[in-house]
Design a protein with these regions (language model features):
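N-terminal alpha-helical transmembrane segments of multi-pass membrane transport
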Residues: 2-131, 148-151
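Membrane-interface loop-to-helix entry segments
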Residues: 3, 65, 69-82, 211, ...
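Flexible loop linkers connecting adjacent transmembrane helices
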Residues: 72-120, 141-146, 150-154, 158, ...
Length: 517
């Protein structure tokens, strides 16, 4: 154990020194940006505006599996719960005449024998996989979806979660079916194995090897990014806000503490991970749901209004700022895909270690994950945020859906060098305006920006620009017809998904934290 701690500390020391130099996040951004941009341009290629190829692929695949297998998310829901409960664990040692243990014909190989090869139980595998999905997507992702697409995005998250149950069923069944078991009993499984073996069986051995290697590489990258960095980032933001930590080193300290805690757990392998998650995940989920239910029932008078908003805004052709029904649908699907990871393949790595000789039994267990993660927990989070936004009995909204109020400091400098100091000025930015201006600074009171040569500028990378349009800042005219003024400020920022609450800007988990507090 001591050796493990020293290894972790030695690993993090270079990064700590880098953080003091330039900022660790900035160094990482600069190093990975070219590669990230290249991969993003392919994976997130937009088939049409706001619809990345990868989201369409995941949702369409989930729909196909749902139809092909005859709605397994509905037909086998009860059986899945029974498998997790252990109802069929030792059926091979029981009497064939025991009706309670008989399979009713839905799926022939759904009965598990816990005495067979594997390392973890069905419940441990479920808890391990859920521990990787419940978190940032449910807390920050839901807030982002509502901030961007309004309450209607919640409905489409639920739809995506229900369809995703079928994807989880398929990928985790394949994970067990094509797993390898070492001489010491260690289980090796996941998309790396079923892509390689499965495609080889179909006569595409080379393609199988290539896709397996690519998945392994991207899975490692994803575990650093969306799997860990995004989670710890949101946790750090919330902790700093709640505890009033303003030190620049606070984030690094919190990150190192989290890394050490996780390191102690994962060094023990899948057995230790499973033994920890089977205790933590149920407690974590129950505590969060109880907190949600407390808020919901103490504001019970708003329940009907909240559900009404969710359903009506889901089909509102004039949904604010995101392109109507299709826009809201895409916002919901994007956040749900990140939240439950259905179709990503990562869950099958944990599920492949289960003690069973029947692959489909674990597929049934896995289909419960998107239901727990998206249909239950995400819906609870959404209700808390929507109810919070009603503003109590006053009925005044805490923030505007699809909009953000931004406070920034600007300076206007006349060409004869006469200086005008502009106090903090409140600017309302519409999400639709942000989309249309692309990288430009999306200020409604300024139509376009031009450089000193009169060329229109779309990305504010330099310090000063000439405002070519009429600008009224803080009630003072800084651009009159025929006059030239230089307006300076911070470089372009992406304000999509952020909201202003009590004069402070919040995003992601910060919005959810405000709703709870």
């Amino acid at each position: 154990m001591k050796k493990a701690f020293f290894i972790l500390l030695a690993t993090f020391m270079p990064f700590i020194s880098l953080a003091s130099e330039k900022g660790l996040d900035q160094k990482i951004d600069e190093a990975f940006k070219p590669f990230s941009d290249f991969v993003s341009s392919i994976v997130f290629f937009e088939v049409f505006e706001g619809a990345p190829f990868v989201i369409i692929l995941l949702v369409c695949s989930a729909l196909f599996f749902t139809l092909y297998f005859g709605f397994p998310n509905i037909r086998f829901f009860g059986k899945a719960i029974n498998v997790v409960r252990g109802k069929y664990d030792h059926v091979d040692h029981s009497s064939a005449g025991n009706n309670d243990l008989a399979v009713d014909g839905d799926i022939k190989d759904t009965i598990a024998d816990e005495s067979k090869e594997g390392e973890v139980t069905h419940f441990q595998a479920l808890a391990t996989a859920v521990s990787g999905t419940v978190g940032n997507g449910n807390i920050a992702g839901v807030a982002l979806a509502i901030a961007l697409g309004g309450p209607g995005a919640t409905f489409w998250m639920i739809v995506c979660g229900l369809l995703g149950m079928s994807s989880k069923f398929v990928e985790c069944t394949l994970g067990v079916q094509y797993r390898d078991i070492g001489k010491d009993g260690t289980v090796y499984g996941g998309p790396m194995y079923y892509l390689s073996k499965g495609l080889k069986e179909k006569g595409f051995a080379t393609l199988g090897k290539v896709t397996a290697v690519l998945f392994a590489i991207f899975c490692i990258g994803g575990s650093f990014g969306g799997g860990n960095a995004a989670q710890s980032n949101q946790a750090t933001i919330v902790l700093k806000d709640l505890m009033g930590l303003s030190s620049t080193s606070a984030g690094a300290i919190i990150g190192i503490i989290l890394a050490l805690i996780i390191g102690v757990i994962i060094i023990g392998g899948i057995k230790r991970i499973a033994s920890v998650t089977e205790k933590i995940v149920p407690f974590m989920a129950v505590m969060y749901l109880l907190a949600c239910l407390y808020i919901i029932f103490t504001n019970f008078s708003f329940i009907d209004d909240a559900f009404s908003l969710i359903f009506t805004e889901a089909f509102n052709p004039k949904a604010i700022g995101v392109g109507g029904v299709i826009g809201v649908l895409l916002v919901g699907f994007k956040r749900a895909a990140f939240s439950n990871e259905a179709g990503a393949g990562s869950a099958s790595i944990a599920h492949s270690a289960v003690k069973t000789k029947y692959s489909a039994s674990e597929g049934l267990v896995a289909l419960l994950e998107p239901f727990i993660d998206t249909v239950v927990i995400c819906t609870m989070t959404a209700l808390v945020i929507i109810i919070f936004n009603f503003g109590g009995e006053s009925g005044k909204q805490q923030f505007q859906y699809g909009k953000v109020e931004v406070q920034e400091e600007f300076q206007a400098v006349e060409l004869n060098k006469k200086l005008y100091k502009v106090e903090k000025e409140q600017i309302v930015v519409n999400a639709d305006t942000i989309q249309k201006t692309n990288k430009g600074y999306p200020i409604e009171s300024v139509a376009t920006w031009e450089d000193s040569l009169g060329n229109e500028v779309s990305d504010r990378d330099t310090t000063f620009f000439i405002a070519s349009a009429y600008a009224k800042i803080n009630g003072v005219d800084y651009k009159k017809e025929g006059d030239s003024y230089i307006v300076g400020g911070e470089k372009h920022k992406d304000f999509k998904g952020k909201v202003m609450i009590d004069g402070k800007l919040y995003e992601g988990a910060g919005i959810t934290t405000q709703a709870f507090s």
